[in-house]
Amino acid sequence: MRFNINNIGLVLCVFLLTSCVYTKFTVYKSFENIETNIRYYKVEEKDGVYKWVEIGIHTFFGAGRKDYLTVSFKEELPKNLTIKSSNFGNIDSAYREDYKIFSKRINIKDVKSDTVYLEFNDNKRYKFYYDFEEK
């Protein structure tokens, strides 16, 4: 059996290009002056019940670029929560209770900024923003 070294090199190159994946996560900022620990913000679900939430753009690089708007919680998920983005609509497409994550694939092309609204059942509302031109 004969192997052509050029074919092996081509296959190896394609494999490396498609299998090398790395990620980047950038955090949204809060409009309000609320407690934070760099990536997570402390929000009040209802009187005296607080949750730590992280909101950001999670980008996967590999064979192609994929961007996701991700909202994750450190503890159990809050009840009666609505998450909306000014550019990308409702964020609920990849909800999994065991992961405590809401995620939606987005296209950030031509988007200058975005605002995410977390709204709890008792009308508590938090706003977070991301400026894509600030990078």
Per-range role (PLM):
Residues 68, 78-82, 113-115:
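Exposed beta-strand and adjacent loop surfaces of beta-rich binding modules
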Residues 17, 83-84, 91:
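Intrinsically disordered, low-complexity segments
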Residues 20-77, 86, 130:
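N-terminal export/targeting and maturation segments
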Residues 5-8, 80-81, 85:
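N-terminal cationic leader/targeting segments used for protein routing and processing
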Residues 1-24:
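Sec-dependent bacterial lipoprotein signal peptides
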Residues 87-126:
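Short, solvent-exposed, Trp/other aromatic-anchored flexible loops in extracytoplasmic proteins
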Residues 124-135:
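Edge beta-strands of extracellular beta-sandwich domains
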